[in-house]
Amino acid sequence: MLTEALEGQLTVVYNTVAASVQVQVEPVGRWFEAFLKRRNRNVSASFQELEEEEELSEEEEDEELQLEEYPMLKTLDPKDWKNQDHYAVLGLAHVRYKATQKQIKAAHKAMVLKHHPDKRKAAGEQIVEGDNDYFTCITKAIEILSDPVKRRAFDSVDPTFDNAVPTKAEGKENFFEVFAPVFERNARWSVKKHFPSLGTMESSFEDVDNFYSFWYNFDSWREFSYLDEEEKEKAECRDERRWIEKQNRASRAQRKKEEMNRIRTLVDTAYNADPRIKKFKEEEKARKESEKKAKVEAKKREQEEKERARQQQEEAARLLKEQQEEAARQAAQQAKKEKEAQKKAIKKERQKLRMTCKSQNYFTDNEADSVRMMEEVEKLCDRLELISLQTLNEALSAGNKEQSKAALEKQVQEVNMQLQKEKDAELQAQQAARGSEHSSAAGGQNNRGWSEEDLQLLIKAVNLFPAGTNARWEVIANYMNQHSSSGVRRTAKDVINKAKTLQKLDPHQKDEINRKAFEKFKKEHSAVPPTVDNAMPSERFDAVGADSNAAAWTTEEQKLLEQALKTYPVSTAERWERISEAVPGRSKKDCMKRYKELVEMIKAKKAAQEQVAAKNKK
């Protein structure tokens, strides 16, 4: 294809070209032979040339092959053929597993021509009859090496192969010089023909990773059937043959396991001693530290950005607040100025009103009316706004004395009417408030039933059921309904209203209620007069005896009593005497009486709570 003409160049056509003609060409001779091979084998001509080159190279190697004489050949025991070196017997000790089948056949042919019994006999050499002649070893060698399966079995246990694994200390200084030959030597067992090399110190991470991945997943063809102790062909029956096969499989599996452990040990040792692995780990560590540092720096920058944004927001909020405060301050100053101006204007208008009325003698003829009008004028000054004052002053200035007087009296009348309305509204509100308080203090329809006994019972119930009790006021109402002798049924609302009323009472009323309650208590608990009955009177724990203390129980005495009840259980001998000793100032009867009261209070409390709970369930 012609290139594009550049600037200044000229394209010239000299002649025309004839059109292409399609013709059919058939191969003949050696080209026809190559065509058939390519078609039948699906290979190219270059591949055929490579095959021919390989065949030529093998023929050249066969021609150049020099056999090595085995000095121990004539001393070999034909019966111990399994332990002989077959390659050495055929003179291929220096080639071994690399020898081709042509080389093996050529070596066998040379050995037969030289060591055949007939040849030696013709030369006058003494021959051992039968299979005891050393020539049998040559026959066994060609039998093993010419069979691919048997040869592989022998190659697997090649006596010249070095199974040693270098230690980590050996490869620490010269890693590549120590381990490279070992891996190349063991690579002969690989099923895969192509395997990665150990490489150098400059090898990339991918190459090193591929190398160790190959060896950690190493697939070996090495097998140990050549070392079978028993041959199944020698078995006399099927069962014996099966037993021999089982024993051979077990021994082969054990040796295979040991071989794979050896390979794994080799790879682990090399991996741990490989300086490249250490370098890669350090690089990876440095990379992670760098990434971590980058993340920390990024996070730090993000925090700084957030902090900067927050400060900007705070600064903006502060400026806005200052602006608002400044605007509010200015507005307040303006309002203050307006208020001051209004005050001055009102003061001026009030002064003008006073001066106008004073100059007209308050539009009256006698002293009494003058005083009254002075009060009315002051009332107008206090009640009227600026506009009303200005309007009134204009009316007083514009008209004559009679008109001014009429305008003043009209304004006074309007202000007095407004004051009267306000007083009436306030009076109605006070009456409504007093009526509400009276209704609340009365406690509804049952106000007439609150006797001194009910009041004391209410106070007792409020103390018995403190704040926090579930459905407290319903419980208190039930307690009063159970223990009141008035017969009036109380609701929770009645109890709440009465409790609030008692809280609003002044101290004198509370003292009076407490005094009446104490007098009633003293009257009910007065000592029983002596009788003429000489019999032993029964004990009453609710009456005040000669050795009893009628004073109310204090909090400290109550705590001492509760602790004594816990300390001395029911099984204690002379329990109440010991309890009374633990409570100073209280006798045995006082303690027993107090205990009885506490039991009754607890029972009543539980009964009231159960009643409320049952009512709530319904």
UniProtKB/Swiss-Prot annotation:
Residues 445-507, 548-603 form the SANT domain. Residues 428-448 have a biased composition (Polar residues). One of its GO terms (cellular component) is nucleus. Residues 281-315, 330-349, 419-448 are annotated as: Disordered. Keywords: Activator, Chaperone, Chromatin regulator, Cytoplasm, Nucleus, Repeat, Transcription, Transcription regulation. InterPro entries: DnaJ_domain, Homeodomain-like_sf, J_dom_sf, Myb_dom, RAC_head, RAC_head_sf, SANT/Myb, SANT_dom. The keyword Transport does not apply. Residues 85-158 form the J domain. One of its GO terms (molecular function) is Hsp70 protein binding. One of its GO terms (biological process) is regulation of translational fidelity. Pfam families: DnaJ, Myb_DNA-binding, RAC_head, ZUO1-like_ZHD. The keyword Repeat applies. It is found in: Nucleus; Cytoplasm, Cytosol. It comes from the Eukaryota. Acts both as a chaperone in the cytosol and as a chromatin regulator in the nucleus. When cytosolic, acts as a molecular chaperone: component of the ribosome-associated complex (RAC), a complex involved in folding or maintaining nascent polypeptides in a folding-competent state. When nuclear, mediates the switching from polycomb-repressed genes to an active state: specifically recruited at histone H2A ubiquitinated at 'Lys-119' (H2AK119ub), and promotes the displacement of the polycomb PRC1 complex from chromatin, thereby facilitating transcription activation. Component of ribosome-associated complex (RAC). This is DnaJ homolog subfamily C member 2. It comes from Danio rerio (Zebrafish).
